[in-house]
Amino acid sequence: EVTFDVSDVEEPQQENTVENRKKKASYVIASPFDGIAGDITTAPDEGFAGKMMGDGAAVEPTDPVVKAPADGEISFIFPTHHAIGFVTADGMEMLLHIGIDTVKLNGEGFEILVEEGAKVKKGDALMKIDLDYVKSHAPSLVSPILCTDLKENEKVRLLKTGAVKAGEDLFAVDIYE
C-alpha cells in the first residue's frame, strides 16, 4: 500500500504573502465612540499613518464618551490622560489615542473614568473628552485606534469608513496560519 503525505506534493510557487494563507480566526474591534472612521493611513500624523505604533483605524469622535472597543482590561493610562492601553479578552494589545499631539495638553480636556487593571466589557465608558477644548488646543481630534503588537500572520481589515456609532464593528484582525 502506497501512502504519501500531502506536503510531499510540490505545488506551484505562489507569492508567499500572508493573505494567500488560510485564515484561522478573526477578532472584531468596535468603534470606541460615535464619529467619522477612516483608514489609519489617513491619520494627520506621520507616525500613526505610517503604522509605526501599530495598525488599526482612525476615528474622529463626535461624542465625548470613549467606550471599551471589546471585552478586556485596562493595561495602562497615560499620566496625561490622552491615551489608554487596553488588552482584549483575546490578548490583543491596543492603544486608544485620543487626538493628535494631545500629550501636550497635560491631561486638560480628558476625564478618565476607569483605573489601570480594571476589567471592562465592550461598551463600558472609559473616558470623557472635552471635544471643544481638545479641538481648539490640539492639531486634530482624529484618534488612532490601534493594535500595537500584531504578529507577522495578523492583518487588520477595516470594516467601516464614514459615520460610525460607538459599539459598531470598526475593524477586524484576521489571523492566518
Which sequence ranges carry the predicted segments?
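Contiguous, well-folded functional domains in the mature portion of proteins
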Residues: F4-E177
